[in-house]
Curated annotation (Swiss-Prot):
It catalyses: tRNA(Lys) + L-lysine + ATP = L-lysyl-tRNA(Lys) + AMP + diphosphate. It comes from the Eukaryota. Belongs to the class-II aminoacyl-tRNA synthetase family. Homodimer. GO terms for molecular function: ATP binding; lysine-tRNA ligase activity; tRNA binding. Its EC number is 6.1.1.6. This is Probable lysine--tRNA ligase, cytoplasmic. It is found in: Cytoplasm. It comes from Enterocytozoon bieneusi (strain H348) (Microsporidian parasite). The lineage of its organism: Eukaryota, Fungi, Fungi incertae sedis, Microsporidia, Enterocytozoonidae. One of its GO terms (biological process) is lysyl-tRNA aminoacylation.
Amino acid sequence: MSKSHNDKEESPDNYYFQRREQMQELQSLGINVYPHKFYFNNTFQDVFTAAETCSSNEKTNISVELVGRVIRARIHSMTNFYDVKKDNDELQIVYNKNLQGKENPIAIKIVDCIRRGDIIGFKGIVGRTKTGEISVFAHEIQILSPCLRAFPSEKNLITNPELIYRHRHIDLLVNQDSRNRFITRSKIIQHIREYFNKIGFLEVETPIMNNKVGGASARPFLTHHNELKIDLYLRVAPELFLKQLVVGGLERVFEIGKNFRNEGIDLTHNPEFTAIEFYMAYADYNDLMCIVEELLSGLVKLIKGSSKFIYQPCKRETIDEIKVPLDFSTPFKRIDILEELNKSLNIELTGENIEKPETLELLIKKAEELNIIVNNPKTLNRMLDAFIGEYIEPQCINPTFVTGFPICMSPLAKDHRSKAGITERFEMFCNGKELVNAYTELNIPDLQRKRFLMQDADANAGDDEAMPNDEDFCQVLEYGLPPTGGCGIGIDRLVMYLTDAANIRDVILFPTLKPEQK
């Protein structure tokens, strides 16, 4: 008859106190359940290799020393079985108390106290059980760190997504899919870093806190520096700092880091998110499109093995599966904003008439007719953004460059060289969501001042996402910013698509959450 320690009937509190009593009893016997070190020199793969020529119910003469976390514990008569996990490998440990513990009752006491979640070190002989399972027949087991709390099952985690986000350590211990997702995330960031290093970019770090906010149209987080007695903002983007570096002669720079925006939380938005921004002197937005295509298509091939793959996130709340074919083959599709809106709305927007008051009136009227909700203040920027979201973004399933942004939507972008009222800016969308924002950088100081004044007008109208005026940055431009292209890529959403995540919180180790209800 076997006894399993996998599922405890007692309450979590009772289990916790029982485990503490067990550990205190072991410690009273002189057993250190939190040793400083355990020496081991083998891996689970060493065991699998050693057992290749071993038959069922046979032992080799190969000794191993290993460590791992117990994920299942079973007692059958006088033999204890432990399934131990390390990294992505699992291995069975067999401990025969008749053979190993006759002259060492403390050893039996130790192994009988081992439960799921405990971290153990063990020494033994490689072999196979009667059923042919590869095992280590242990003659010594040591508790290296006990798990005092009841160890949840993978089933419990899947049915309770809040537990995943609030207790990521537990999720990673029992949910292999989650572990793999974050391993893939690391590979994605590593590939991006290697790509830019390879083409001659310098990785830099810029401030997270600053007494000004800029670089993107977004609502910032505010904090206070007690010693300096000043308010500081968490950065919404590192753009203005990175362009200062280009002015200073660092002609190819990039930064991978956190940005913060005090805005909504949903399936694809988290207030704290990871992005890469890169700036390249003597390049324009056409060059940036080529870089984005090469970077992302290569990344997709690395992770998925092909430019084409199926994005199929599983929504835990509904268990509904969505299958979205995505194709990152180059060149990416392109859509011009005004051309597409004119076709969809049956109107005639141009770069010349887009800034006229009657154009804003027309767009407000169209939105009312089509029941498109736009929050006040209904600025031209907000109206255009709403129509882009309604008519253009849903067309962008495969990677698509959206181009032709009017000046009012792009205060830091340079005027288009041949289209009045338009900037040399693009956003790249995939699966209807923005992944990339880039443009030929505006490097004319007086024109940049004028753009900031336009943003001031929106701010005075009540737009709390308008970009604030930054005279210091304009003075930086007066030292000479060479023709430059700048680009930002959201890493979290990219990871979502490459790991079949339905929620951005699934690809952020510690996402922003509401306070837990006590």
